[in-house]
Regions:
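Elongated, mostly alpha-helical coiled-coil "stalk/stator" tethers of large membrane protein machines
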Residues: 1-94
Length: 94
């Protein structure tokens, strides 16, 4: 079985995004269920989702979040950030 949040977390870690930008994205995606719902809702047009991403998130995360949105995976953002934290801890201990 594929661990989707972990896979996204690994990609995010490899992107080496500025911690402040990650914090912004984490806050938006974990504290706004309405935002997550809009980004996973199949009734919201893809172009609208992309506009939302470009208006709210740091540019360094646009493509990553667009892929998550296109795949309907934004709903796993909280688990992804938890997995990301685990990767960071693991790398710091090696």
């Amino acid at each position: 079985m594929i661990d989707l949040p972990l896979n996204y977390a690994r990609v995010l870690y490899d992107m080496n995004i500025d911690p402040e930008n990650l914090s912004t994205a984490r806050s938006l995606l974990t504290e706004s269920p309405e935002l997550v719902e809009a980004l996973v809702n199949p009734l919201v047009r893809r172009s609208e989702k992309r506009n939302i991403i470009e208006k709210l998130f740091p540019e360094s995360l646009w493509n990553f979040l667009k892929v998550m949105s296109d795949n309907g995976d934004v709903g796993c953002a909280s688990e992804m950030f938890d997995a990301y934290d685990g990767i960071v801890r693991e790398k710091e201990n090696t």
